[in-house]
Amino acid sequence: MKTFLILAMAVALAKAQSTDEITNLVQFGKLVMCLGNIGYTEGLEYDGYGCFCGKGGKGTPVDATDRCCEVHDNCYGQAVEEGKCWSVETYGTTYWYDQSTSGSCSIRCWEEGDYNSLVPRKACKAAICECDRKAAQCFADNRPTFNRKYLNYAKDTC
């Protein structure tokens, strides 16, 4: 069943332009599902939500959930500004994390020093994982603000 969910998410996220992008989006989706204690279908609903969730983002967030996506976009941008990542790799970077599900889910992203010395772009991997973890936790914390009327929101109205 787990394999099916991962495969289904990869297919659903096939808008991504490379295998690495799909892998990164699947990783992010797994964090969202774990920390939010939600299923695969609910996890996919964030794509295209409001003005900032999904590809692109502009205007003013429609609610706290959408604000999580704006903060996520800004976090990726900050990783680039700080020289940790190249802009072309933010959505294609795969990373490692530890997950504990005893009780409720908790995620600990690997820090730069946790990676083997031969692994390239460790600072980027650590930064992107932390951006994804924070966004997933933000989604979980703000799940009560999630409003179905903002699904597949017309971004040109933002």
From Swiss-Prot:
Its cofactor is Ca(2+). Ca(2+) binds at residues 54, 56, 73. It catalyses: a 1,2-diacyl-sn-glycero-3-phosphocholine + H2O = a 1-acyl-sn-glycero-3-phosphocholine + a fatty acid + H(+). The keyword Calcium applies. Pfam families: Phospholip_A2_1 (PF00068). Disulfide bonds join 51-158, 53-69, 68-138, 75-131, 85-124, 109-129. Residues 17-23 form a propeptide. Binds 1 Ca(2+) ion per subunit. InterPro entries: PLipase_A2, PLipase_A2_dom, PLipase_A2_dom_sf, PLipase_A2_His_AS. Gene3D superfamilies: Phospholipase A2 domain. The active site is at 72, 132. Its EC number is 3.1.1.4. The keyword Lipid metabolism applies. GO terms for biological process: arachidonate secretion; killing of cells of another organism; lipid catabolic process; phospholipid metabolic process. It is an enzyme of class 3 (hydrolase). It is found in: Secreted. It comes from the Eukaryota. Expressed by the venom gland. PANTHER family: PHOSPHOLIPASE A2, PHOSPHOLIPASE A2 FAMILY MEMBER. Belongs to the phospholipase A2 family. Group I subfamily. Monomer. This is Phospholipase A2 AP-PLA2-II.
